[in-house]
Amino acid sequence: MTTFTAKSETVQRDWYLVDAAGKTLGRLSTELARRLRGKHKPVYTPHVDTGDYLVVINAEKIVVTGNKLKDKKYHRFTGYIGNLKTESLEQALQRHPERVIEIAVKGMLPKGPMGRTMYRKLKVYSGAEHPHAAQQPQVLDI
């Protein structure tokens, strides 16, 4: 008997809709990363992308515990001398709430070409509207 290895072209990829309202950022992100990798499937193979597509709505309504709203910092560098920009989680949620979830999930995925492919299957929207109704996503309760 040989070991089963999933083939990328035969993997069944489903679309799921996740409502982030009232969910904790870290706990939500770990489950999203797990499903993007495909670890919830019995056909999971480490070197093959077996994950599903995830549509996350209501990103502006996520919850964090403790003082993370003021203490957690996001840094970005423009490339110019002295232009290291820093903003708190509270400011980031006001400016672009969907990017907070994207950054958290991206850090939990593998670094490399396959990780980037997995990351592209994550669609995050700040409101309750999304343009993926044609894919008929199933509601996923996390």
Curated annotation (Swiss-Prot):
One BP term from GO: negative regulation of translation
CDD domains (UniProt xref): Ribosomal_L13 (cd00392)
GO cellular component terms given for this protein: cytosolic large ribosomal subunit
Keywords: Ribonucleoprotein, Ribosomal protein
Tree of life domain: Bacteria
GO molecular function: mRNA binding; structural constituent of ribosome
Residue ranges of coiled coil: none
Residue pairs linked by disulfide bridges in the UniProt entry: none
Pfam families tied to this protein: Ribosomal_L13
Job description of the protein: This protein is one of the early assembly proteins of the 50S ribosomal subunit, although it is not seen to bind rRNA by itself. It is important during the early stages of 50S assembly.
Family: Belongs to the universal ribosomal protein uL13 family.
Quaternary organization: Part of the 50S ribosomal subunit.
Protein name in the entry: Large ribosomal subunit protein uL13
